Every structure is written in structure tokens, then in C-alpha cells.
């Protein structure tokens, strides 16, 4: 019996010393949720509603010199009551050298400062209108909402270190299918997107971006043919982000036909082939790590003319219960000239959110 007890104990000890592979130990699970209430008094279309803005579940890991990420999203992307679950990120990145990191898979397009910003960190009820329309969210071309992402390959890096070792220049360039997330290339023509920015002082970035490509599967209403439409875009960006002070401004311009709204695959010739927009915002601490005040001015013109400009003047607060739980509130006065009746151009908008991370 003593011999059996010894053997059992030895066997138990062997089981407790099983070594877990390093790549398994490196896997991290995280996520976040965004709960929302919105109301507006647009004449003839007043509404208010609770909404589940976003939920994401994320796996991050590392295998040698390669980082990887898989991210699934649940959202009411089509509006309240129409939930969508989809894979948004799936990529690996070779990170051995800071001056040349190579990413392959499905990930954020290399366009603008705001696009890759975490939606909670971004601090507002939504990304700016011009980002949504010209950076692959609810894209002007009619591409389905892709969260600013596509499938492809990207090279990026930080170079030109100063005397303190801080790099002064960042570059990034990518080649993508051009169709958004979870879709193969439909016309064998790739999108090329690139950008670069200088970092003259800690916390400051000044950059520019360019994008040329196409989108397939669009209907020409004149001929009835299915065609590809061009995407030629550029952006200028500036940002200061340090010690809880965040200021950012961007201007985007697009040339190329489109439907004007996500999910619509028919060219809308009436709005022309150009669009542009801009935003400027500031978020500042009122109570450090607890309460921030914010203001944003933004405009989007779907035909690059003032007769169809939509402008929002926004103010609000972000209150942090903890680092992982916050409440956001904002009020906006909206001037929407895409509404046919001039007497209905102006209305009020309110958004409140409870956001959490885990």
C-alpha cells in the first residue's frame, strides 16, 4: 500500500509540472462594450432610443517575433434592432524591427489619425462624419460598414531617432483588396494607401495620407452595367495628445463616383464625383483622471458644395468611474442642408453612453 501511495503521489506531482508552451502563455483575452442612448428633434423624424452600440471580444498573442490578433464584433451597424456579428480583425505582424514591421491579414487601413483610434479612447458618440464616409466605415462608395478595415499587407515603421532616442518620423504603406472586411478582391485591382507623419515634440503628430484604388460591383443607373468606381483620396492631419489633453484636426478629400451611403451599390450621379470634410476637437481634463470636458466642430459635404453640407457643433463631458468604466455625454446643434426643406435644416441631438472594458 505504501508503494502504491508513493506511485500515486509521484504521478500527481508529474501532472502539476506540465509546462505550458510560451505562445499559449502569451495569449490574452480582452474586450469592451458600449451602451448608448440617443435622441434628436429633427422635424418630422423625432426619435429617441436605447441602443447597443458595440461589443468586441479580442484575443491577442505573440509567437516569436510575430504578434497576432483576432477580434469579433457585435453591433447594431444597420441601426437599432438589426444586430450584426462579424470578424473584424484577423492578422499577424512581424515586429522584429521597429523601422520595418510587416502586417498581413484583415486590419485597419493606413488612412488618417482617427481611423485606428480605439472607439472608447476616441471620446465621442461616433467617429467624425468625414471619417465614417471617406475612411471605410459607412463608405461613400456604398461599401458595407467595415470599421475602416480591409484585407491586405502593410509595412510601417518609426525612423530618424533624435538625441534622446525618440523617433521623429513614422511611415506606413499598404496594399488591400479594396472591398472592405471579409470579402475577396472583386476586380483584381488593389487599393494602395500610404501615410507619413513627423513628431517634432513629445505628443505631437503632423501628417499626410494618400489613397488610390477602386470598388467593384457597382451599378451604373444610366447603362445598367455593373462597373468599378475609382477611389482617389487624401488627408491632412494634426494632433497633440499628452497628459490627458487631446487636440486633433483632419481634412479629407475624395474624388470618385459613389452612391453616397453604405450598402447602396448604385451610382448617384446627382451628387457629383467629389466629397470632402473636416473636424476639429479638443478634450481637456477638468479633474485629472476623473472628468474631461470636450468640444468638436465637424462638417461633411457629400458633393464638396455647401448646399449639401452637414455640420455639427458638439459639447460634452467624459466621466471616469474607473480606468475601465466611463460615462460620456454630449449635446450637438446640427445644421443639415441635405434636408430639402430649409426650415428643417437645424435640429438638436443628444447622446449618452456607458462604456466598459475588461
Regions found by a protein language model. Give the residues of each.
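Outer membrane beta-barrel
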Residues: 16-178, 186-193, 197-206, 281-285, ...
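Active-site-proximal beta-alpha loop/turn segments in soluble metabolic enzymes
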Residues: 174-183, 217-222
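Interfacial loop-to-helix transition and helix-capping segments at the boundaries
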Residues: 183-189, 273-275
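Outer-membrane beta-barrel pore domains
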Residues: 42-45, 91-93, 103-106, 115, ...
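Cleavable N-terminal export/targeting peptides
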Residues: 1-20
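Short, electropositive, low-hydrophobicity segments enriched in small/polar residues
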Residues: 35, 109, 182, 211, ...
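Charge-dense, low-complexity intrinsically disordered segments
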Residues: 142, 183, 269
